[in-house]
Every structure is written in structure tokens, then in C-alpha cells.
């Protein structure tokens, strides 16, 4: 391909890979100037008919899916006994490389990425297309930082009411049901993979990881992972629901769309045709292409029968979408539409009015087939004879096919070699040379090497290999600046001129890999080149950075729609303190019943904090004594989560305190403050349980899954306070309204530095037993 300067209407330019014959080339349309990437399939005529059919089936899927968050297939051209696939140009490269450079992302950026992935994936699921190989290596960034899903080599059509059988994907991202070899729901498995990506974006590492593949698979099947304590409760809850081992109880796409962590985003309204009437007449050419997708090329009669039936079937939907591409509007119809547009524009101009594109489309009633111009649309430049048919007639030869991912299913023509066909070792690849587009270093490359077992799996650790730094030509993809590339930039277009296209790949430019950063104001500044690399994870939250117009930075810590920040809290355990700000607005009523699987451990919200700054305005921040202020000692604090709403939880706490007061435990001075929604009381020195005196406060806060009671020690014995808070937790558990997330945490939590008496030896045990007998 190095001697080819053009393919059809596309002028070839820089090589995006290693420079070999299988490397992708940056291309520009001769007349429209559109940028694209041309990927060759060398030896196409030497493939068997079944191998060609599988590759063509993937191309049909790519052509069917038209969504802003899915990589766009532009054209397929045959020239010089080769097949050239023209796909969308993605200046941002892979999300994987961006994660290697940046490490972890803020919750705001993570939510934006996750929402875009889910939007594209939901559109595929509506077409009954399951991706089955979602991972950061298969997600790409455009010039504006938007994510697009690519690599549909393992995608499959899942008929309604049926399950998939083939085990495929990468073990780090594959769902437990795929690893265990069971029949599975492809949509639920894709949601699991999105949960792994969600975790990696937030933390910079994978939730399930091990050098031993057997241990890794066991971890995935058990679903046990360490939940980071420095993320919001909403993010934790969504992670638990997405990484549910039981696919039948795993959160669905509809529930994810309504989850508070993502409720601030507006769901795009992209319609999909649902057809019940029989297709008449049936085009044999379209059926031939659909038979590649449904893998029934040998016997297409069942496909004809379904198209002629009276039921709304997925075959009819895909037939309708494919017919729009194979049979675009005639030139006469296009000319009539253009005449109507000119007439409308002339009338509007005479009246001193201006019409936008949406008004024009509504006036002439022209359906929009694609979100942006593509070469096979009616208004595009006609293709030459070499690309008149998007697919070729299968040719049976005796050639070899050395890039199949198993014995029956060859890999994607656009797919990276890191993907495996089943749960076998597949580690994230190292940094690849070139611009890391979705088309370089494919499985067609002759110099492909298996993934190394030492490939990095922690995205927070930068790669310090000098050879890797010299081989990478992509510029640093900092989230604040590098998504500003414009395809219409004169400097870019000038470099892509046909006369300036180099015949080979020039010397690689020196790449500066990202290092651990230091935070200065609202910018992230890299250390000098000579500084030593620090492998420790460091997180910085740029509070004033505006990443998306759809997100309100002032309200995003609690991502509800129209949420407002009105409260803050500081929590601490005897092992250290943790500062945490959270919005305490009322949550949707539908989330009172959301539960988290009991077998997972809830990480403590009280891990040590890197800041000592006080959070003003907290409704339950007590006064500190002179010694506490002198030694910067914070009071003990503990949270108990309940499924009740805040008002009901307040009533239950007051009822327990008053009952204890009647039993003679020594409870006194019970005061309810309706302004701060807190209850204060104390245990007197003279009490029937010989407890040390203590003064405490209980603040009730609304959460999206119910409410929480925050117990704060104001003065007195921390041991008595610990018994008191634990007793409330046990009472809530006995009454059945302790939140499952909190229940699993208390059951699995390790011993704390402060000694805690057992439940049976607790001073409150006798009264709890008496209350159980009475109830």
C-alpha cells in the first residue's frame, strides 16, 4: 500500500501505524476535503468464502449503526485485488492511551464519558446488536473529546427471548457468565463491561486483576473487589449495581439512564423504525447482505419468511435501515428537494427572515439518514466504479487466513490483536506507536507480537521506557486543552494537501509522556523532565474546569437534576479522618428501594484525608475542647444508613431514646433541632449500666437510597459512644430497615483500632433482648 497514492476518491497521506503494508493511512476526500482513515485488507482474494462472509457481516453491522457515539463506516472500496475500508478519522486516539497519560478522572469527566458510552451502546442494543468486547482499547476520542465505540468484530445479533452461547471478549472486562461458559444475555454482559470501564476511569486501575489467569477468573466469578472510599455514594451504588455477578438482578440500561449519578444528562431521542407490516417487495440484494449478519447465507429462506410475516421483528428493522443505504433517494428527487430549499430560502430572504436547517428539513420533509455527511449519502460525491458495490462476491481459494480469533470466527478487520476469543490471558496492551488510531497495529499486521504478561494494568503509572517515549508520535491528550483540534484548521489541511503527502513515514517525533502532576491553581503542571518518577497515585480535582455544557459544575458533587449543594459533612473514625462534601437534596422516591448486593463489602467513608480544612456550615459539626483544638483532633463520627426517609428515621431515633430514658439507662436532655435536623442527648454519670458519661448528637440526612444517621461524639467516652452507635445499628437491623449496603459493611468490616465489645457482651444487650421479647 506504500506505493498507492489514492483509493477511489480518497487521496492517501501519512501512515498511522508502523509503516508496513497493513498500516492505516490518513486520507482526504478529493472534492469534499473530508478526513478519514483508510484501512487495507491485504490478500482479500485469497480468503475463503466463509472468511469473506464474516468480514462482510461486520461491515454490514458497521453500516447499519449510525449514532454520534459509534465509529462511522464511510466506504468500502475494491482496488488492485485488495479491499479498503474507509472509516471515520479520530484525532483523539484510544481512550486507553488517554487513561495511561492521565490516570484517573474526576467524577464529572467520568460521568460524561460513561454517558456517551451508554448512549451508543443503548442504540446498538435497540437494534439487538451486542458488542461483547467493550474495553478502553476499543473506545476512541474525536477532536472534541467525545467517545465513539468501535471494533465490532465480536458483535452479534441477539434475537428477542434467546441467549448467546459463544464465549468471547477480554478476561478483565468479560462478565462472570461468559467466563463460566454459560448461556448469557449479551446486553447484560455489555453493562458489566461498562462497569469495569467506569471503575477504571474513576480509580485508574481495574477492579479485578491478577498476574495468574486462574486467580483473575476466580475473582471475576466471585465479584469481590475493593470499592474506593474517595468516590461519592452515588458512584459507589452505580458501580455495585453494574458489577452484580447475578445477571438477572444486574442494573438494566433503562435503570442506568434514570440513576442519580447520570440523571443530569439529557437522553438523545434517536428513533429506530419498528415495522409490523410485511416487506413488499423484498429486495434480494438487501437479503443477501442481511444473511451475512444472521449467518444464513446458505439458506436465506427463513429470512424471507420473517420479512413477509405480520410481526415486528428485528429482521424488518435492519432491512429498513440497510435499504436506506443501498437505495438512496434518486437524483431527480434530490434535485426537487434542492429546488424546494432554494425557493424557501428565497421567500424567507425576501421577508427578512432566516431559516435554520431544522426548519428547512421540516418544511420539505426530508428524513435525515446520517448525523454528518458520509460518502454513500445522496448528496455526496458519486463514487467511481471501483466502489460501486460495498461488498464483493465471495471468492473461494486455497489461501491461508492467519488472523482468525478461533477456528470458526475470524477477527474484525478493524480489531486489535489484544482481543481473545475466550477467557484466556489478555492484558492491556502497551503504548503503541503512531497516533493510536483505531486502525493501526491490527491483527492483519505481519509484525504482530502476543501481548506481554508484563503489560501495565494500572493506568496511574506512566510508562518510563525511553524507546516507548521516542516511538510515540501522538501529542499529550490533556482533558482541558487537547480536545480543541479542528479538522478545518488551515495548518492541518495544508499538511494534508495531495502534493505534500509523503510516500513513507517520517522520523518519529519525540514524545513527552505524562508524569505525576502538581496542582497549581486550576492547572495541572507536569514535573520537569529530570524529576524522579513517583509511582504513588495522586488525584487532583479541578473545581472550576468546565468540561461539558450539560453539566453544572456547582451542582455536580451530587448529580441530581436541579440539585443544589446545601450541606457538608466531616466524618472521622479513630483510625483517622476523612473530609467529604455532599449535596443533601431530596432524592427521587423511586430510589428508596434500590439495594446493593449483601455479599460485597462497603468501604469505609472515614479513610484518612489529605486535607485539614474545615467544612463550614455543617449541621452536625460539634464544638471541640481546648485539647482537641490544640492537637487538631476531630471528634468520633459514625454513619448508619437506613432505607427509611429522613422524617421516619428521626421518629425512630427519638422513640428509641425515649424508651431508653424510661428504662433507666441514664439518657437525659433529649433535644430535637428541626432547623439542623439533629437530635442531641447525653448519658448521665449515674446510669444503670455503669457507662461512662457521654454527650452525643445524631444528624439525619437524606440520601438517594433512603437516609443516614450521623452519630457525632461531642464529649465524653469514645467507648460508650461506640457502643451507642453500634446498638442503634443493631436495632435498625432487627426492625428491618437497615440499608443492605450498610448491613454488608458492618458484617464484613475489619476490626478497628478502638476495641469494640461483642454484641452479646454489649451493655445495651439486655435491653435489646427485652425489646425483642416485647415486640
UniProtKB/Swiss-Prot annotation:
Entry comment on modification after translation: Autophosphorylated.
Binding site for ATP: 16-24, 39
Region annotation Disordered: where it falls in the sequence: 549-620
Gene Ontology BP, a term: cellular response to glucose starvation
SUPFAM superfamilies per UniProt: Protein kinase-like (PK-like)
Residue stretches of biased makeup (Polar residues): 584-593
GO cellular component: Cdr2 medial cortical node complex; cytoplasm; medial cortex; medial cortical node; mitotic spindle pole body; nucleus
GO molecular function: ATP binding; protein serine kinase activity; protein serine/threonine kinase activity; protein-membrane adaptor activity; signaling adaptor activity
Keyword field contains Phosphoprotein: yes
Every Protein kinase domain range: 10-262
Family: Belongs to the protein kinase superfamily. CAMK Ser/Thr protein kinase family. NIM1 subfamily.
Classification via PANTHER family: MAP/MICROTUBULE AFFINITY-REGULATING KINASE, NON-SPECIFIC SERINE_THREONINE PROTEIN KINASE
Designated name of the protein: Mitosis inducer protein kinase cdr2
Organism: Schizosaccharomyces pombe (strain 972 / ATCC 24843) (Fission yeast)
Taxonomic path: Eukaryota, Fungi, Dikarya, Ascomycota, Taphrinomycotina
